[in-house]
From Swiss-Prot:
Species annotation: Rattus norvegicus
Record-given protein name: SMR1 protein
UniProt entry keywords in alphabetical sequence: Cleavage on pair of basic residues, Glycoprotein, Hormone, Secreted, Signal
Pfam families linked: PROL5-SMR
GO molecular-function term, one example from the UniProt record: hormone activity
Post-translational modification: Several O-linked glycosylation sites might be present in the C-terminal part.
Induction notes from the record: By androgens; strongly.
Glycoprotein recorded as keyword: yes
Biased composition (Polar residues): 109-139
Note: SMR1 mRNA is about 1000 times more abundant in the submandibular gland of male than female.
Region feature (Disordered): 23-43, 99-146
Length: 146
């Protein structure tokens, strides 16, 4: 049974290796004396030939189009404001402000916070301090109930 697993595992490894080789293109021969044409260099770096010296000058431009959020969340005590304001392609400005809770009192303060009811504190109820001598031994309350 182990030999079957070994054969199956080798078959899978061989299949994966061959599938990876099929996707790969032909290997290039590196020639350090041959200068690469600037038009074939990667365009995302913005590589441009220098007209004065024949060397390549590098200008990196990353276009960012960020819009400020439509809804600003104003939580007291936290930083609020648009997250990032981009001007041009190289200048960044971040505008923020720190807000604290408003110390002014409420315009309509509540007159009474909560209505509370006191418990019945009548002392006319007679409560026995002794326990009954019956088998279940429960307290006996005399009178005073509603």
């Amino acid at each position: 049974m182990k030999s079957l697993y070994l054969i199956f595992g080798l078959w899978i490894l061989l299949a994966c290796f061959q599938s990876g080789e099929g996707v790969r293109g032909p290997r290039r021969q590196h020639n350090p004396r041959r200068q690469q044409d600037p038009s074939t260099l990667p365009h995302y770096l913005g590589l441009q030939p220098d007209p004065n010296g024949g060397q390549i000058g590098v200008t990196i431009t990353i276009p960012l189009n960020l819009q400020p959020p439509r809804v600003l969340v104003n939580l007291p005590g936290f930083i609020t404001g648009p997250p990032l304001v981009v001007q041009g392609t190289t200048e960044y400005q971040y505008q923020w402000q720190l807000t604290a809770p408003d110390p002014t009192p409420l315009s309509n303060p509540p007159t009474q916070l909560h209505s509370t009811e006191q418990a019945n504190t009548k002392t006319d109820a007679k409560i026995s301090n002794t326990t009954a001598t019956t088998q279940n031994s429960t307290d006996i309350f005399e009178g005073g109930g509603k």
